[in-house]
Amino acid sequence: MKLTSHDIIRKPVITEKSMAAMAEKKYTFIVHVNANKSQVKRAVEEVFDVKVKDVNTINGLGKTKRMGVHVGKRSDYKKAIVTLTEESKAIEFFDGLQ
């Protein structure tokens, strides 16, 4: 299956820890489970028009959840922490908000 840049990057992670890392030009995204580091790097550079220095990925296993006697499982996920170069501009997630 051929993944486009918009298929690879699912959504940004907006937590207190990830917001603090943005000061060091480190941005966290939920990415497609089958995407590798080079695909994530290419996708971030294309979508946000920045230069990527480094990509770290974390595979997360979905939790098992119960509702009464029914047992289900949440989907597995992959998180990517993308470090930008010093000369790159910052990625603004909240441009349109007032």
Curated annotation (Swiss-Prot):
Q: What is the lineage of its organism?
A: Bacteria, Bacillati, Bacillota, Clostridia, Eubacteriales
Record's keyword annotation contains Ribosomal protein: yes
Among InterPro entries, the record links this protein to:
Nucleotide-bd_a/b_plait_sf, Ribosomal_uL23-like, Ribosomal_uL23/eL15/eS24_sf, Ribosomal_uL23_CS
Presence of keyword Hydrolase: no
Task: Spell out where the chain crosses the membrane.
Answer: none
Family membership noted in the UniProt record: Belongs to the universal ribosomal protein uL23 family.
Q: Name one GO cellular component term.
A: ribosome
Name this polypeptide is given: Large ribosomal subunit protein uL23
Quaternary organization: Part of the 50S ribosomal subunit. Contacts protein L29, and trigger factor when it is bound to the ribosome.
NCBIfam families, per the entry: PRK05738.2-4 (NF004363)
Task: Name the species this protein comes from.
Answer: Clostridium botulinum (strain Alaska E43 / Type E3)
Give the encoding gene's name.
rplW
Give the protein's function: One of the early assembly proteins it binds 23S rRNA. One of the proteins that surrounds the polypeptide exit tunnel on the outside of the ribosome. Forms the main docking site for trigger factor binding to the ribosome.
Biological processes per GO annotation: translation
Q: Pfam families, alphabetically? A: Ribosomal_L23
Q: Name one GO molecular function term.
A: rRNA binding
The cross-references to PROSITE patterns, in alphabetical order and at most eight, read: RIBOSOMAL_L23
Domain of life here?
A: Bacteria
> Which keywords does this chain's UniProt record carry?
Ribonucleoprotein, Ribosomal protein, RNA-binding, rRNA-binding
